[in-house]
Amino acid sequence: MNILVTNDDGVTADGILCLARTLSKKYKVTVVAPETEQSAVGHAITLRLPLWLRKLDINENFEIYSVSGTPADCVKMGIDVVLGEKPDLLISGINRGNNLGTDVVYSGTVSGALEGAIAGVPSIAVSSYSFENPMYETAAKFILDFLEEFDVRSIPRFTALNINVPSVPYDQIKGWKLTRQSKRMYDDYFEKRVDPSGGNYYWMMGTIIEDDPDPKADYKAIAENYVSVTPISVFLTNEEYLKRLEERYEDKTIR
Amino acid sequence: MNILVTNDDGVTADGILCLARTLSKKYKVTVVAPETEQSAVGHAITLRLPLWLRKLDINENFEIYSVSGTPADCVKMGIDVVLGEKPDLLISGINRGNNLGTDVVYSGTVSGALEGAIAGVPSIAVSSYSFENPMYETAAKFILDFLEEFDVRSIPRFTALNINVPSVPYDQIKGWKLTRQSKRMYDDYFEKRVDPSGGNYYWMMGTIIEDDPDPKADYKAIAENYVSVTPISVFLTNEEYLKRLEERYEDKTIR
């Protein structure tokens, strides 16, 4: 199996190197990842500037390329320029810190996987729960096991798996659960400061809110030391609300 | 009604000024938009750098603020810092060029509206179909009419409306249709060039693919000179596939 690996923490981040080394024991791995950290870039792509691609001279069992862009850029270039064909699987990660609830829309890691899904490649995003104490070895070992058990070819087009792994030693992981993207979100606030020339600037801060009644909420699996596996798609239509609107509004003519 | 207006083309773009001027005839409008163009930034937010907020000294019927960040940053700062409370409505646009099909995941304009939806504000993204010949007056006039007819307070939490308006004179618009985010996407390719110091760089290009069998596909309404109105949510779980996975895999224990 040929696996394309990307991330949003940058090409030299500990998480991606741990993942690529672990996968390369069994699979052919190619890393194509951002030159610089791209956390929280969402599904940004680079249209107004060109992209530089560089093969790194690093002594590993796999090839490593850096791209002067975002995770989604890396996936596009990885497929079209580096590999010249679709890989059998794309994995984006291992992210430093979790991607649960509304994180999914901000996350560069998740967007890397969704870009693979758009391109028609079975794709997985993987994150280690704790930003302060990520345990990449646990997540990498889990992914290796998961690929034995889960038929990634069954993942439908335009859909990816969003996997979050508790930051605990591997032998404390109880297993994995199929979960749903939860309503976990942030209550934002801004810390105001004054720069040396008198201008106001602001740091974005946020408090996590976890109050989703759904027993399948992604964060609840993690709290019990299970890995959460959420299938997510690039189609955002709210079907239930669309149906209600259709009942209320016919197609409307103007005038 | 208090309306917060943002966009991704930047605070001085023609589209946002046309929208804000039109809306300010009837509503209290505050513009909080990116200092510089942020097209295709997706749902990026600025976490590693602070944000600068500046009130512009521009002679209009409404206040204009610029933020040194993304559309999602603008919405967060617009609510928490500029207004200090939730507006009654958020509108992101008018974008130069359409946001149909998979554009939705790349679009800064759409992300602005989804950020409003996360914050619990009724939110709308609006785009003029043509990048080359956008017709902002048509889109702005349509939005004014639409707000008379559509109860924005009925939009559920975590959901926004993604509106695309054909680039034709207003009297050629036939009406509006409720639509679904389509499978419209791009077949990417990269044009390789060599920089003056001998390095390779690449321009991302793409050919549009429109082959969605769904009669409610967003782009089909536009082709018939209807405005497309697609309700989209920030929850990406693929429910159908989740159900199939649940039938196949029980919650899995390791060891």
From Swiss-Prot, chains A, B:
Binds 1 divalent metal cation per subunit. Its EC number is 3.1.3.5. Keywords: Cytoplasm, Hydrolase, Metal-binding, Nucleotide-binding. The keyword Hydrolase applies. It is found in: Cytoplasm. It comes from the Bacteria. InterPro entries: SurE (IPR030048), SurE-like_Pase/nucleotidase (IPR002828), SurE-like_sf (IPR036523). The keyword Metal-binding applies. One of its GO terms (cellular component) is cytoplasm. Pfam families: SurE. GO terms for molecular function: 3'-nucleotidase activity; 5'-nucleotidase activity; exopolyphosphatase activity; metal ion binding; nucleotide binding. A divalent metal cation binds at D8, D9, S39, N95. It catalyses: a ribonucleoside 5'-phosphate + H2O = a ribonucleoside + phosphate. Its cofactor is a divalent metal cation. It is an enzyme of class 3 (hydrolase). Nucleotidase that shows phosphatase activity on nucleoside 5'-monophosphates. PANTHER family: 5'-NUCLEOTIDASE SURE, 5'_3'-NUCLEOTIDASE SURE. Belongs to the SurE nucleotidase family. This is 5'-nucleotidase SurE. It comes from Thermosipho africanus (strain TCF52B). The gene is surE.
